[in-house]
């Protein structure tokens, strides 16, 4: 693939050992795809599949009235255009949504006619509420803020078998249970109790013997026994009986009597164990029946009812034990054949038979009544109610739905194949088979299920969650419609009279606004956005809760491989419950996570890629991505490391079915951005992955010198950068927009051949960081589709750049880097390397109060002239003003209640209508501790209220900008069209034209240049077809002009109409402040390997350790932070970063060399750097100009990529270091022979340190834990109500907690007065603290400590236990 426009400018050298077989898929595909299927907006009505909105509608409609004479049918639905676009919704605080209209049909039947006849049909479109739309980057704008719907990992519907691990019963006996979980409907559980009786329960209610359920589905005791047991057949004789001999049932049993063959020879003596030889002898003797004594039958259980054939009298019932009297009665009635249940103690337990004994119901009706009584205790069981309840439990499609997934899981677990064939409700067979499998488990055959296996957990994505909410809304509507349908005929109602869209809107609004899975988007940087959208949570409605989730659920499971990242998960109570999707993972049609593998055909690894789910994967042997292959794609080694069904093993290549796609396939996006991840301890890698998401975008992003090669994918997929939608020529570039004239071959006929990209300028993100886009193309550049045109926050030339490359020295420095503290050079701060811009939004509203409206004005009494200077005539601050704490941003006055008026004054007021004369100043001021620059002001005015000048000027600006966009489009379209017309006209003969063009003359370029272009249309061509083309061109141009005018009008209408504001609000003004935050002590910083710390001191450059050539270190870290934490990746990163910088320096030296051979030398050096190891780069493709541009971009360091688990080896790092620092340079810089360490000098004394120091470049981040946001000082502030102690935290203006351990410290030093002060007057001694204040006022510095309030609370709590506790003062 050729390099794209931006890739050419700076090629990342990759150390990967293998080519990519498959590119990383689009990272937001899951979210976008899911919502697309939910809406199916672009799909034609006829082609819509039964999913999403369509499925919700079809499952509820048709709605039939109670009497069946009217029904409401669903025809189709359509989504309208949203009124405002995303940006406008964010500004106005609206939801980005489009109106949903459903076409429904009301059918009324004729009551007079006996057979159903349609009387009339009414069809109508009905508004069904607003459906939020997803933005192109996979988020939603709800009430003006961006939100993300996180996918949920929940237990898949289906049937699951498990046991209690011996925890229930004291003996440690395993109690097996089964559970049928539907997508929606009642849960059905089956469970054994310690006595081996099998029970069932519905929705965790009271348990009942399982045979009640079997009888309720129409089985008799005989059929139940026939289903679960094999029978032994006997024929009674006058003494004893003959028994059918089945050899396998006798093996290992004790003979209770002598067993003889036909000749009467004893083969097995009494009380001997029967073995295989005995059975062989019996079989060879041709024995089919053996005679057994009478007592052998006693205690056996009858399989069928025994009935006297003559009288029809029942002698014994099925499941009765055989006794002497039963046998006598049978002989008397001449019933000699009998069948008993075959059971044994080992693997044929009599469980169902025992259960049947405990069951007291007689027949199907009694069983159903028993179930009714359990479900609805206290209600009288009428026949209809009992019948209806039982049907609704598991057999009605309205109340019970297994879903396709559930049906597939039930089928596959019960051994009926892996497809979703069958009804979506439970069937009798399902229930029977489930019980059968459970009994087999108790008998010791089969395996229980692992509920943490990813084949038993599925992902519910946005679309599915939204569909469930929509359906819930529709169900509420259905109830209301049913009520009204009865009146539809008499009152001549239309469909829109029947349907009220409120419940639907409410359900949708509630889900998107306040569901646990709808979260405020984490927008700190592009990575945090992308990770948030790829997150998979086990929490939420229908999921787990933090408190109940055990260790197993949170643990890493073998099936997570390639599906869920084993590294990235939060620390703390949510660990393991919130996960991130792996890099290549995607969802299959059933919602299970699947991961790609390369298929192996005839021992060769092919390019065919198959996606396998966790269930499918268990059938195959899968090799790892780093297995060595030869040129043909065959395995080199005799034994290959593989995985099969979650176990790792070594096996011969012949047995291997699949191979991993890439080494990075097992980790998530954030983890795959950590270079040398394979050398880091997993706990630290987890911190590293999580902390990258908190990196604050710096003022000037800088690409990481050592990356992993996935930075570009992340930056582009996150939507932070601007990508070209179509290729073309850059026509115009400024800071706000990029205009591209599209290539002819990519332009669709009839469309405008212009793409205008408006860039986002200084916009506030959800986390108050700054989102700003900068163009990286120049006018006249040729770009292709997909090229990066502009960088966003934290991206550098289309690559993710979260931090800065810092020169790091690992050495202690006077205790300033003790315990993870960080020592930083002043130069870093002076160069604004870690300066970030944060944008604060301050809002003020003018309300209509009882005493009159509040007013936004400049006319405020007692305001200093310096304050007023910043406000314009409307009382709103100018853009660009620098403000600090307590400065007025918007002047506002509120009428204030008068003191009591005399009746005369009241009367005068009433007559002359004078409003309250007194007003108080309630202006918007800058909060304490904030300084910044005003960068934007937005004014929203209610409909019907006159706009002030400021609001009008803002609208005019906006319109001017829009007009300019339209003019640009028009200019390019017209130029393009006139170019074509010119080609058409030149050289053609004419019948006449402007400027007295004679008939028969030919048109020349010079002639056309003299005319105004619109006069060209007046030329009358003699050739008829060409004249038609000219006419069409004119019409198309005029039509375009008309379209642009319409668009402008539309925009103007939108801007000039009043804004929707909350009730009682007349005006709302938002002021945006840009706050510059420089790095300062107390800020948290971190590398990408979990090596975090807090800045302890910013040291002057001249005091920092420096190298022999005078280069000073930027950051000094403590070397003790590495060994115990086992994140050695940071050391390797430092070495490779050192090499990258050195190579860049060598290229810079070459560029300064102004000789002719310059390009040749640079080419040769670049070839050496890029193409000696790793996947290589195609330097030869580049022209000389491109090579020079590339070299200029590499001066500050050659970017390296060391992909996860496939990165640079030690030898490669050494080789790069040698390329970067030839002997003469190494000698000059006093590097050690390995080039990985250098001799440093103390900046303060100039002395050499006594041993060489590891030094190099690391990509270091500033995290979103800034001391400015955390530090505050409490004077007297709020106290907690009960304990009367100061509150904690900055928001509450709280104090510092003086806790248990701090008290111990004071006690240890015997500082009793300080201790007393801390625990009383500085905390919760109410009288004491007021007293101290008084004393200070009087100038008397004495403390009178009293009783702390918390002690009184303790006394009161003890009293609440009815213990009277009093203090005796002595």
UniProtKB/Swiss-Prot annotation:
It catalyses: RNA(n) + a ribonucleoside 5'-triphosphate = RNA(n+1) + diphosphate. Pfam families: RNA_pol_Rpb2_1, RNA_pol_Rpb2_2, RNA_pol_Rpb2_3, RNA_pol_Rpb2_45, RNA_pol_Rpb2_6, RNA_pol_Rpb2_7. Its EC number is 2.7.7.6. GO terms for molecular function: DNA binding; DNA-directed RNA polymerase activity; ribonucleoside binding. It is an enzyme of class 2 (transferase). InterPro entries: DNA-dir_RNA_pol_bsu_ext_1_sf (IPR042107), DNA-dir_RNA_pol_bsu_external_1 (IPR019462), DNA-dir_RNA_pol_su2 (IPR015712), DNA-dir_RNAP_su2_dom (IPR007120), DNA-dir_RNAP_su2_hyb_sf (IPR037033), RNA_pol_bsu_bac (IPR010243), RNA_pol_bsu_CS (IPR007121), RNA_pol_bsu_protrusion (IPR007644). The keyword Protein biosynthesis does not apply. Keywords: DNA-directed RNA polymerase, Nucleotidyltransferase, Transcription, Transferase. One of its GO terms (biological process) is DNA-templated transcription. One of its GO terms (cellular component) is DNA-directed RNA polymerase complex. The keyword Secreted does not apply. The RNAP catalytic core consists of 2 alpha, 1 beta, 1 beta' and 1 omega subunit. When a sigma factor is associated with the core the holoenzyme is formed, which can initiate transcription. DNA-dependent RNA polymerase catalyzes the transcription of DNA into RNA using the four ribonucleoside triphosphates as substrates. Belongs to the RNA polymerase beta chain family. This is DNA-directed RNA polymerase subunit beta. The lineage of its organism: Bacteria, Pseudomonadati, Pseudomonadota, Betaproteobacteria, Burkholderiales. The gene is rpoB.
